Amino acid sequence: MPIRIDKKLPAVEILRTENIFVMDDQRAAHQDIRPLKILILNLMPQKMVTETQLLRHLANTPLQLDIDFLYMESHRSKTTRSEHMETFYKTFLEVKDEYFDGMIITGAPVEHLPFEEVDYWEEFRQMLEWSKTHVYSTLHICWGAQAGLYLRYGVEKYQMDSKLSGIYPQDTLKEGHLLFRGFDDSYVSPHSRHTEISKEEVLNKTNLEILSEGPQVGVSILASRDLREIYSFGHLEYDRDTLAKEYFRDRDAGFDPHIPENYFKDDDVNQVPCLCWSSSAALFFSNWVNHAVYQETPFXWRKIXDDASAYGYL
């Protein structure tokens, strides 16, 4: 799939070396199709790494996507140059009058804080409320999923005894579900978090479908029946070495972290870590774009407001 992004974005050259088709504005303007508009709220500290990870997985269908990156203006990134943010990212005020077919909300390293103590919480709350009428399908990842469930349904997050870090098995629970088309009965994916949600709260407080779960990770992916809300607590987008970098970062900072489970051969951190989730990741993101976004989104974006009323969002 051609993804349409600023040709100066650092991720472009990485993606081109991987034979991923990236299209600039000039070429895209000559294609007589309505591209899908995707907004990515990138809350991860290593912005450029996350950009590349997500764009790589969004490039798996023949559809043309227009990608915009969003950041919280009430938070200043300490790990990404301000020039990068000013060049390639938009603020909520800059996009609030636009309509998007899909949105991805990433994880964030703030799960140790109560939601209300996150410095950009009020701006995040306003953005999520806005998304009900301006975005058709929203994919929430990790902390983004916990925050979305808390704001929409009052589902709490709970501190775990120790960090969940590793590659874990999960079972698919709804045979033939569109998000899991092409999946086997079980799959593995990276998880990296200190907090979890309660399955009982999900069942009692929401009408969401639990689509996958595992013995170590608990609830893994859930979604509304119309696929306008999708919540994933793992990190299918992660690269082979992402968990390794997190482990070495924490070890070097003196935190004595556990070695990520099911990741390094024989738990030897000098070995190259396994990569055993890339096919599942490609399927999942492709299914989201094809079935939750492309098949369902209204051709005219402003129809989303009418759909929001019909689905009970307004």
Swiss-Prot record:
GO terms for biological process: L-methionine biosynthetic process from homoserine via O-succinyl-L-homoserine and cystathionine. The active site is at C142 (acyl-thioester intermediate), H235 (proton acceptor), E237. InterPro entries: Class_I_gatase-like (IPR029062), HST_MetA (IPR005697), MetA_family (IPR033752). Pathway: Amino-acid biosynthesis; L-methionine biosynthesis via de novo pathway; O-acetyl-L-homoserine from L-homoserine: step 1/1. Substrate binds at K163, S192, R249. GO terms for molecular function: homoserine O-acetyltransferase activity; homoserine O-succinyltransferase activity. CDD domains: GATase1_HTS (cd03131). Its main location: cytoplasm. Keywords: Acyltransferase, Amino-acid biosynthesis, Cytoplasm, Methionine biosynthesis, Transferase. Pfam families: HTS (PF04204). It comes from the Bacteria. Transfers an acetyl group from acetyl-CoA to L-homoserine, forming acetyl-L-homoserine. PANTHER family: HOMOSERINE O-SUCCINYLTRANSFERASE (PTHR20919:SF0). Belongs to the MetA family. This is Homoserine O-acetyltransferase.
